[in-house]
């Protein structure tokens, strides 16, 4: 850190702390999204009520984590809405054909 005074040093420390905290949240959002997408692929390959329920459960978990990230200011509200919309659009056409 190349801070020239006390307040700049403190701001740099806070920024680093927040960066690490935000990174863990963003990482968990991405992980839950990937888990959901894999469940959707499994449901598309073998459309059973159990696989549909699994996909819906994982969708709810991803929605919850995205909403919490938005609430805490880690994701912009529009970014969170876009992620949720894209997740929902993956399952919708498969449900209608099955």
UniProtKB/Swiss-Prot annotation:
Protein keywords: Ribonucleoprotein, Ribosomal protein, RNA-binding, rRNA-binding
Q: Name one GO biological process term.
A: translation
Which SUPFAM superfamilies does its entry note? Answer: Ribosomal protein S20
GO CC aspect terms: cytosol; small ribosomal subunit
Answer yes or no on keyword Zinc: no
- An example Gene Ontology molecular-function term: small ribosomal subunit rRNA binding
> What domain of life does the UniProt record list for this protein's source?
Bacteria
InterPro entries from the UniProt entry:
Ribosomal_bS20, Ribosomal_bS20_sf
Pfam families per the record? Ribosomal_S20p
Positions of the UniProt region annotated as Disordered: 76-98
Keyword Ribonucleoprotein attached: yes
The UniProt similarity line reads:
Belongs to the bacterial ribosomal protein bS20 family.
Q: Give the matching PANTHER family.
A: 30S RIBOSOMAL PROTEIN S20 (PTHR33398), SMALL RIBOSOMAL SUBUNIT PROTEIN BS20C (PTHR33398:SF1)
Q: What is the protein's known function?
A: Binds directly to 16S ribosomal RNA.
Q: What is this protein called?
A: Small ribosomal subunit protein bS20
Gene from which the chain derives: rpsT
